[in-house]
C-alpha cells in the first residue's frame, strides 16, 4: 500500500488528480457530518476548503521544484492556516446576554480549520497522514457528537430568553411558570 503512495509523491498529472480526489473525499467525509446535522459550513464548504488548501501545497511544491530551489515551502501553507481563521470566525455566533451567553459554531470553525490543514497534508503528498487525520477527525466530529448529545447535553436546567414588550405585568408569566413547577433562578 505504501508503495502505491510513493508512486504518487512527484508532481505528475496522476499525482495532482489523486491529491484533489483525496482532498475531495476527506473534505466530504467531514462536511457530510456537518451537513447532516444542519450546521452552517457543510459538505460543499469543507470540500472547497480542503481542495483549496491542497492546491496551495501543490503550488508550493511546483514553485520549489521549478522556479526557486531555496523557496520556503511552508510560507503559503502558513497563510492558509491563518487565513482560514477569518472564514471560521464567520461561523461563530454568540447569543444571549452576559450571564446566559451561548457560543455556537466553534466545532464548525474548528472543522473548517482542520479541513484546511488536511488539505495541506494532501497537497504536500503526505497521503498516509491525511487519511489517518480524516479518520480521526471524522471520529471526533461524528462519533463524539453522539456521545455529547446522549450524555452531556441532557440537563434538568433550561435557559430561556424572553423579550417582553406586552402591557400586562411580567408577574403573569412568572405565575404561569410556577404553576408548571418551573423554578426561575435569574432575571434581568
Language-model segments: which ranges?
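Small-residue-rich segments of transmembrane alpha-helices in multi-pass membrane proteins
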Residues: 48-58, 82, 107-121, 164-167
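Alpha-helical transmembrane segments and their membrane-interface boundaries
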Residues: 1-72, 76
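Lipid-exposed faces of alpha-helical membrane segments in multi-pass integral membrane proteins
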Residues: 18-25, 52, 81, 132, ...
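Ligand-binding beta-strand-loop-alpha-helix segment within the catalytic cores
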Residues: 61, 77-89
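Juxtamembrane membrane-interface segments at transmembrane alpha-helix termini
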Residues: 57-64, 117-123, 142-151
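Canonical alpha-helical transmembrane segment with a positive-inside/aromatic-interface signature
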Residues: 100-101, 126-188
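C-terminal ends of transmembrane helices
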Residues: 27-39, 87-100, 146
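Structural signal for the N-terminal portions of transmembrane helices
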Residues: 70-76, 95, 101-142
Amino acid at each position: 500500500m505504501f508503495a502505491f503512495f510513493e508512486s504518487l509523491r512527484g508532481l505528475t498529472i496522476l499525482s495532482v488528480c489523486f491529491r484533489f480526489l483525496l482532498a475531495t473525499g476527506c473534505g466530504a467525509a467531514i462536511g457530510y457530518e456537518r451537513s447532516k446535522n444542519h450546521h452552517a459550513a457543510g459538505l460543499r464548504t469543507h470540500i472547497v476548503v480542503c481542495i483549496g488548501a491542497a492546491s496551495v501545497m501543490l503550488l508550493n511544491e511546483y514553485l520549489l521544484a521549478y522556479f526557486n530551489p531555496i523557496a520556503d515551502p511552508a510560507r503559503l501553507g502558513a497563510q492558509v492556516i491563518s487565513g482560514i481563521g477569518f472564514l471560521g470566525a464567520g461561523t461563530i455566533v454568540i447569543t444571549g446576554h452576559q450571564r446566559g451567553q451561548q457560543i455556537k459554531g466553534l466545532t464548525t470553525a474548528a472543522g473548517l480549520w482542520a479541513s484546511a490543514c488536511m488539505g495541506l497534508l494532501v497537497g504536500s503528498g503526505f497521503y498516509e497522514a491525511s487519511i489517518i487525520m480524516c479518520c480521526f477527525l471524522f471520529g471526533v466530529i461524528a462519533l463524539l457528537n453522539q456521545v455529547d448529545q446522549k450524555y452531556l447535553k441532557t440537563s434538568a436546567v433550561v435557559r430561556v430568553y424572553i423579550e417582553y414588550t406586552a402591557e400586562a405585568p411580567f408577574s403573569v408569566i412568572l405565575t404561569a411558570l410556577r404553576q408548571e413547577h418551573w423554578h426561575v433562578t435569574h432575571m434581568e
